[in-house]
């Protein structure tokens, strides 16, 4: 989760909305939250989901979307208390932990825990974004080329996107992003409320928190404490604000209640978050092109290059 192509899908931690259903089979689909109700909510209910579509995603009432945040532009976090407490991965909080570490206070290697709000450490430059709403803006972006998107010029597209950003940002109140889907056939707008006062609350020692990098990333079972804890702050009116000692813990519209009941085989589990990138929306033609053209070309180039590199390595 180190880059951001915004779709709200894959979670950073194991967040589950769990209800027993031993007969349920995994469904590895990937959906935008605004389409839950019309595409797959009924299917998820049959698999054990007990939340309504409105409880998952709503622009008028608090919902699950209000508890899942984008941390910086690189990770996902989840709000777990009515005082803005946020969980994320240790590797997502790594740079923040490093920025506060010194020779005298080696928080990276020794860990850190605050005993009060006053002891929490401000992290300059770190922010979190709460999704306010998202919308299909394909018609606005492609305009007169809606039926022939291949004719839309990049200059036209960027101008139309810029107009949308200005219109919906409300003079800087919101962060607005417009992202292409299906290689530019569709465009979706994401409107965020951004909080710039984020503070470190807890970090385990690196010996516990380090998740293994590429060496261990795809190995199971793995026993690591890949987590860190932060808190989001707001002004006294609960609005986004730059860091100030007068700021107070943010009161979220919704937070995830923590359960210690454990899970059972067959419990319903849903993953929600901001993946770094995804190719889950590739068409069959794109998959065919990758398998039959792109990958073979890369492999052929590698087969030509690697022997040359090996020969040079052996002489050194």
Located regions from the model:
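Terminal presequence/propeptide segments associated with secretion/organelle targeting
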Residues: 19-316
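Bacterial Sec-dependent N-terminal signal peptides
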Residues: 1-26
């Amino acid at each position: 989760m180190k880059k951001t192509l915004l779709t709200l899908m894959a979670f950073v931690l194991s967040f589950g909305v769990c209800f027993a259903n031993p007969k349920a089979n995994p469904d590895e689909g990937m959906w935008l939250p605004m389409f839950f109700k019309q595409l797959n909510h009924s299917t998820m209910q049959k698999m054990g989901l007990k939340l309504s579509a409105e409880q998952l995603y709503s622009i008028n009432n608090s919902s699950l979307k209000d508890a899942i945040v984008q941390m910086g532009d690189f990770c996902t976090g989840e709000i777990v208390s009515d005082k803005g407490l946020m969980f994320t991965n240790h590797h997502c909080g790594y740079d923040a932990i490093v920025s506060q570490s010194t020779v005298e206070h080696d928080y990276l290697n020794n860990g850190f825990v605050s005993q009060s709000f006053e002891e929490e450490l401000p992290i300059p430059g770190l922010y979190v974004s709460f999704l306010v709403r998202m919308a299909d803006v394909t018609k606005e972006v492609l305009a007169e080329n809606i039926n022939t998107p291949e004719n839309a010029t990049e200059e036209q597209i960027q101008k139309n996107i810029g107009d949308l950003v200005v219109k919906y940002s409300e003079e800087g109140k919101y962060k607005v992003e417009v992202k292409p889907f299906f290689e530019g056939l569709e465009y979706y707008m994401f409107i965020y409320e951004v909080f710039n006062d984020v503070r470190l609350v807890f970090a385990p020692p690196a010996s516990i928190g380090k998740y293994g990098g590429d060496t261990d990333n795809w190995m199971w079972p793995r026993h690591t404490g890949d987590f860190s804890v932060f808190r989001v702050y707001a002004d006294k009116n609960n609005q986004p604000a730059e860091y100030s000692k007068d700021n107070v813990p943010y009161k979220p519209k919704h937070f995830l209640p923590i359960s210690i009941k454990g899970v059972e085989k067959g419990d319903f589990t849903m993953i929600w978050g901001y993946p770094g990138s995804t190719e889950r929306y590739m068409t069959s033609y794109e998959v065919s092109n990758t398998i039959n053209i792109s990958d073979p070309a890369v492999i052929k180039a590698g087969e030509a290059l690697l022997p040359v590199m090996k020969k040079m390595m052996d002489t050194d």
